[in-house]
Each structure stands twice: as structure tokens, then as C-alpha cells.
């Protein structure tokens, strides 16, 4: 086609893509290190780090090594972590979850002392703390709701007493946000926030995480309390209930497969929305990259940016450290 034969096009979107400078000027969404939360697994012992086999590049830390990791994270600009604990013992009543000298309580105190500016969020659920691997107490094969909520209240208060800035109930029991808010307020911890796993689906993407915490369910699945992946209206109901009960931040989990839920949540509710880039999503990228099928760094950054574009204000990701280095 000659110069004289050019199409009579008024609007040429490619003009704004011609150079990197132009593309950056008109970019609609930007990922920053401030968006990232690093999930951190702590285990008993001293001076030990274990790689999670199904999550290459992700590790379990003893508390002393977790402290060192947190110092490095903070130096990279990451301002928040979410703590998950592997207890020394599991009990049917889940009492280790609220032990003042439990794994999470010790970790909170040690990290807060060493890196006081770091925002410490803590997982509140019973799956690592009972032999059943379910998020609640179990009786005759049934996951108990109200009895579980009583334990979660104690667990949340114990985390607050240890110095947690936010508690993050991930259990999906009915009514637990209001009950935890009440327990925190009554124990003089009204400043401790709640990040609710409000729309948490019964997903197949959680497998490597359960390996990391040794918390796979020992019978059945979690579909009686986690959400059906087919549902979206139900997610809006769950989010609304948690906000009414006192959640400061709401989360959608998993991430990439549920960006529509993030979008609906952000459009409908005027609260910060978090998303969890879960272990299965992370492991798939790692596996494909190990085979040379994808560029891991580019896929990592694209995945995180897509979560931001969908409306997420906060991104929980095992890639937080790598992404922070890239964003510096």
C-alpha cells in the first residue's frame, strides 16, 4: 500500500503504543510494592528453613529465621506479612491455636520486636491446629459452626495480645466476623483490624498450601463451608455480611480464576479489597517456567497487574519478594 493509499482513519490507538514513554504515560493501572503482602509460614525449631516441595522458591521458617526474612522484606519495601503457623501438636479441640506460647503468638512477638513498623496480619482458622485438617471443630464428621467461632474468638484475641495489627479469619464460618470484632473490642483491642476472607471458594488451587502447613483435610472436602465456584451472587452476600459485622478489609480467594468476583466486589462495596494469589496459581507458573514454556518474571508481573486492574487494592502473593525486587 503506497503513501497515497493510506486508510482514512481518524482514531489510531496504536499512536499511544508507539514508544515505551507513551505507553507509560497512558497506563491505566500501576502495580507498586505497597500493594503486596507476603504470606509467611512459621514452624517449630531453631535456625532452619525448609523449601515447600510443591512450591519451589517458597519456604517454611523457624521463628528466628522468620525474623531475618521479615527484616529483608521490609528493606525491600514490603510493609505487610500474613503469618501462618505449623504447631508442634494438633488437638481435637484446637486449643493450641490460642496458646499464649503457641507458634503464631511467639512469632508475632519476635517479629514485632525486631521490625516494629511491619504490619503483621495473622491467619485465624483451625485447619493447621487439629488432626482433621478442617477449618473448624469436628463432631461425627460434621464441621461445627458456633463452637468453632468461640475458638476463633480466643485465637484472634491471643494474636492481638501478642501484637498483631490485623487478624485474617480464613475459616468461612457463619457469623465469625461479628463475634471476633466483639471479642477484640471487649478485650481492649479495638484498634486491631479484621481482614475477612469474605469470598473464599472451595477451590482445587489450594493443594500446595496445604502441603506447606501439613493441613490437608483428612476426610471429605470443604464444600460445606467454603463457597461453590459456580456462584457470584452468593459472594456478594458473603461480602456484605462481613462488612456489616465489622470487616475492615475483604478478600476474594483464589485470585486469577476469580477476577470477576474482585471486580464485582470493588464496584459494589466501598471498602479495600484484597485478593490472594494462591499456591496452586504460583505452582503452575513455577512448573511451566521450569520447563521453559513461559517467561516466569513476565508472567508473574502480568498476573499481579491483572489483579490490580480487576480492582484489588491489596495482593497476597508468594511472589511478593521477587516482585518487590523487580519494582525497585
From Swiss-Prot:
Stimulated by magnesium, inhibited by zinc. It holds the Pfam family ALAD. Mg(2+) binds at residue 238. SMART domains: ALAD. It comes from the Bacteria. Keywords: Heme biosynthesis, Lyase, Magnesium, Metal-binding, Porphyrin biosynthesis. GO terms for biological process: protoporphyrinogen IX biosynthetic process. One of its GO terms (cellular component) is cytosol. SUPFAM superfamilies: Aldolase (SSF51569). GO terms for molecular function: porphobilinogen synthase activity; zinc ion binding. Its EC number is 4.2.1.24. PANTHER family: DELTA-AMINOLEVULINIC ACID DEHYDRATASE. Does not seem to have a metal requirement for activity. Homooctamer. Belongs to the ALAD family. NCBIfam families: PRK09283.1. This is Delta-aminolevulinic acid dehydratase.
Amino acid at each position: 500500500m503506497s503513501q497515497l493509499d493510506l486508510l482514512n482513519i481518524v482514531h489510531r490507538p496504536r499512536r499511544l503504543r508507539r514508544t515505551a514513554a507513551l505507553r507509560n504515560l497512558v497506563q491505566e493501572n500501576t502495580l507498586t510494592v505497597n500493594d503486596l503482602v507476603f504470606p509467611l509460614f512459621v514452624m517449630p525449631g531453631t535456625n532452619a528453613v525448609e523449601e515447600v516441595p510443591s512450591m519451589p522458591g517458597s519456604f517454611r521458617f523457624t521463628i528466628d529465621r522468620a525474623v531475618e526474612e521479615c527484616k529483608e522484606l521490609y528493606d525491600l519495601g514490603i510493609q505487610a506479612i500474613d503469618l501462618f503457623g505449623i504447631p508442634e501438636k494438633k488437638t481435637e479441640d484446637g486449643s493450641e491455636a490460642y496458646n499464649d506460647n503457641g507458634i503464631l503468638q511467639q512469632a508475632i512477638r519476635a517479629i514485632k520486636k525486631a521490625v516494629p513498623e511491619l504490619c503483621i496480619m495473622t491467619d485465624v482458622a483451625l485447619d493447621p491446629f487439629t488432626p482433621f485438617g478442617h477449618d473448624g471443630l469436628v463432631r461425627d464428621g460434621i464441621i461445627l459452626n458456633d463452637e468453632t467461632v468461640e475458638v476463633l474468638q480466643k485465637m484472634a484475641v491471643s494474636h492481638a495480645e501478642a501484637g498483631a495489627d490485623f487478624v485474617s479469619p480464613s475459616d468461612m464460618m457463619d457469623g465469625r466476623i461479628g463475634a471476633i470484632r466483639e471479642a477484640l473490642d471487649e478485650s481492649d483491642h479495638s484498634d486491631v483490624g479484621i481482614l475477612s476472607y469474605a469470598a473464599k471458594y472451595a477451590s482445587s488451587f489450594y493443594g500446595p498450601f496445604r502441603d506447606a502447613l501439613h493441613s490437608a483435610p483428612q476426610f471429605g472436602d470443604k464444600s460445606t463451608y467454603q463457597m461453590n465456584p459456580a456462584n457470584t451472587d452468593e459472594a456478594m452476600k458473603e461480602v456484605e455480611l462481613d462488612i456489616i459485622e465489622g470487616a475492615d478489609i475483604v478478600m476474594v480467594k483464589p485470585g486469577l480464576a476469580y477476577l470477576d468476583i474482585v471486580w464485582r466486589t470493588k464496584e459494589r462495596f466501598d471498602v479495600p479489597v484484597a485478593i490472594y494469589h494462591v499456591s496452586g496459581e504460583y505452582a503452575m507458573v513455577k512448573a511451566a517456567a521450569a520447563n521453559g514454556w513461559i517467561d516466569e518474571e513476565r508472567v508473574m508481573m502480568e498476573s499481579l497487574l491483572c489483579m490490580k486492574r480487576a480492582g484489588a487494592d491489596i495482593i497476597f502473593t508468594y511472589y511478593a519478594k521477587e516482585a518487590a525486587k523487580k519494582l525497585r
